[in-house]
Amino acid sequence: MNNVDTLIFDFGGVLIDWNPAYVFLKEFRGDQEEMSHFLNTICSWEWNENQDAGYSLQKATDERVAMYPEHERLIRMYYGRWEEMLGYEHSDTVELLKTFKDHNKYRLIGLTNWSHETFPVALERFDFLSWFEGIVV
């Protein structure tokens, strides 16, 4: 007995590759250690998650620049070049999503923690994001 009628697909890491290193590795001229220090202490995952939770990108960026003025250019780059952090689509997962969409047997729901300010960038770039009946943030 199968009572499953809804499938949920996460966006970042499941359907779409996302990684700040796509921007910052170039900026740090390939120096992984320096890049990691910057991403772990200045523009950390925790800091980014605050914006994913709804905090203004502009306000968060300005506050971070005030804390680390010597890194202003790099801090402003974090959201200024966010689109470049979007890598490729995970084609196997997108193909699976398309199969479910074409069979029209399941409700398809998307799941993301991306900010309401960054999500439209992904929506514009990846057509398959429009296949979902709803999106949970």
Which residues make up each language-model segment?
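Active-site neighborhood of HAD-like aspartate-dependent phosphohydrolases
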Residues: M1-C43
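Generic structural signal for small/hydrophobic residues in well-ordered secondary structure
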Residues: D10-G13, G54, F100, G110, ...
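Short histidine/acidic/glycine/proline-rich micro-motifs that form metal-
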Residues: L15, E46-N48, R81-G87
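A metal-dependent, Asp-based hydrolase signature
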Residues: N48-Y79
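Short, acidic loop-to-helix structural element flanking the phosphoryl-transfer center
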Residues: R73-I109
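Cofactor-binding loop segments of dinucleotide-utilizing enzymes, especially the Rossmann-like FAD-
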Residues: N113
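Substrate-recognition "cap/lid" segment bordering the active-site pocket of phosphatases
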Residues: H116-V137
